[in-house]
């Protein structure tokens, strides 16, 4: 475990795969092949689809819709790997079909649309907004700003302003609670989703948002790191899908256990450590969650209570789970870091109708473990 300052300070990113002995050429080949399958592959493998001359969308293959989560994930993947045309297609589609201009959610994005662009919901999901904003800022810094809607930096700053000031005029609700600075599950509720907490993004929003908003984002980064300590079980490392503001599981609708959303927490903690190295708790948490899964086979992954008690129900996205557990190796110092990465490397992309979520997490993990999930700063 190399304990230098985070990549934000050094500009240097760990290539964990190379550290563990994988051939650099094979790593780059795997990255290129994974992009090709997901964005250019056969109909039964890809999750990105071109539409018309200048649009494109990410398909949730299990639900046959386009989600703000997936659109923003696709944009982040595209900016990290330098695919500007794909990025612009996704963003144009998002602005055209998902962006809401009226009503209590004006300024946000509908979380679910049909592939033809018709809306399935008029509600937003804040994990989409935060990924849109981060991807847009990176695009602004990597490629420069164009004409609207490709004026990436302004689009990002306007969105971030909406996310924290919405409702101040009495219409709608902010996505972050103004008092405790914690991201909400949806704007009109007062509880959270631990997997939405991205302090490493908020640190960057604190640099690049509109000046009057920067202090809020700095405080949000601190609040989210504290929150994750509360939401992750002190022995197993597991966190619930929904949690109250004190971190305790919110099981009112059955989402108080470790299941699909929860998997992202390990990945987020790993990337926060790689970028900023703010809190050594991240290393302890990564060790805990990898230790919990060390003796479990992916085909037998389950839904778990956060104390580790297994339910009968099998995991819906086992490839996603083993991927995020591997991404935690950015922070992990324990004996399971290498084994988690080896399991990931030896697992192929998922096929079939449930592949969308698993393979998004797979590509993010591949980016992160190869040193290619980077902070793009202004020139």
Regions found by a protein language model. Name each.
Residues 64-71, 118-144:
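Aromatic-rich carbohydrate-recognition surfaces in CAZymes
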Residues 2-33, 37-40, 45-46, 64-68, ...:
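Extended ligand-binding clefts on enzyme/binding-domain cores
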Residues 74, 86-87, 149, 156, ...:
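Solenoid-repeat scaffolds in large eukaryotic assemblies
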Residues 214-222, 338-345, 378-379:
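Alpha-helical repeat scaffolds
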Residues 343-353:
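Solenoid-like repeat scaffolds
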Residues 78, 91, 136, 153, ...:
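Inward-facing hydrophobic residues that define packing positions of alpha-helical scaffold repeats
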Residues 75-82, 131-142, 200-207, 267-274, ...:
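Short glycine/serine- and small hydrophobic-enriched flexible loop segments
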Residues 27-73, 78-121:
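Internal amphipathic alpha-helical repeat/solenoid segments
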């Amino acid at each position: 475990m190399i304990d230098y300052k985070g990549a934000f300070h050094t500009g240097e990113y760990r290539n964990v795969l190379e550290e563990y002995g994988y051939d650099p050429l094979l790593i780059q080949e795997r990255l290129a092949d994974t992009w090709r399958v997901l964005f250019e592959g056969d109909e039964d493998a890809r999750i990105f689809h071109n539409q018309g001359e200048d649009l494109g969308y990410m398909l949730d293959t299990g639900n046959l819709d386009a989600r703000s989560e997936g659109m923003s994930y696709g944009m982040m993947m595209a900016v990290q790997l330098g695919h500007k045309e794909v990025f612009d297609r996704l963003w144009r589609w998002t602005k055209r079909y998902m962006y809401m201009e009226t009503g209590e959610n004006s300024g946000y994005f509908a979380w679910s649309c049909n592939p033809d662009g018709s809306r399935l919901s008029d509600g937003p999901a804040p994990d989409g907004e935060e990924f849109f904003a981060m991807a847009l800022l990176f695009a602004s810094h990597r490629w420069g700003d164009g004409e609207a809607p490709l004026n990436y930096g302004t689009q990002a700053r306007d969105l971030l302003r909406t996310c924290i000031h919405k409702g101040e005029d009495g219409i709608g609700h902010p996505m972050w609670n103004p008092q405790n600075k914690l991201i909400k599950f949806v704007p009109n509720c007062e509880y959270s989703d631990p997997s939405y907490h991205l302090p490493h993004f908020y640190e960057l929003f604190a640099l690049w948002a509109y000046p009057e908003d920067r202090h809020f984002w700095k405080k949000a980064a601190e609040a989210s790191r504290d929150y994750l300590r509360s939401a992750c079980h002190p022995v197993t490392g597991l966190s619930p899908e929904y949690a109250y503001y004190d971190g305790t599981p919110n099981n009112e609708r059955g989402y108080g256990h470790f299941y699909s959303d929860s998997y992202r927490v390990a990945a987020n903690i790993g990337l926060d450590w790689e970028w900023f190295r703010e809190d050594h708790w991240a290393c302890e948490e990564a060790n805990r969650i990898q230790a919990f899964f060390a003796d479990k086979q992916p085909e037998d992954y389950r839904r778990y209570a956060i104390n580790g008690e297994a339910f009968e129900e099998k995991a819906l996205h086992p490839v996603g789970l083993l991927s995020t557990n591997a991404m935690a190796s950015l922070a992990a110092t324990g004996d399971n870091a290498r084994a988690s990465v080896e399991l990931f490397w030896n697992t192929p992309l998922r096929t079939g109708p449930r592949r969308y979520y698993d393979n998004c997490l797979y590509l993010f993990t591949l980016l992160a473990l190869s040193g290619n999930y980077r902070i793009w700063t202004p020139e």
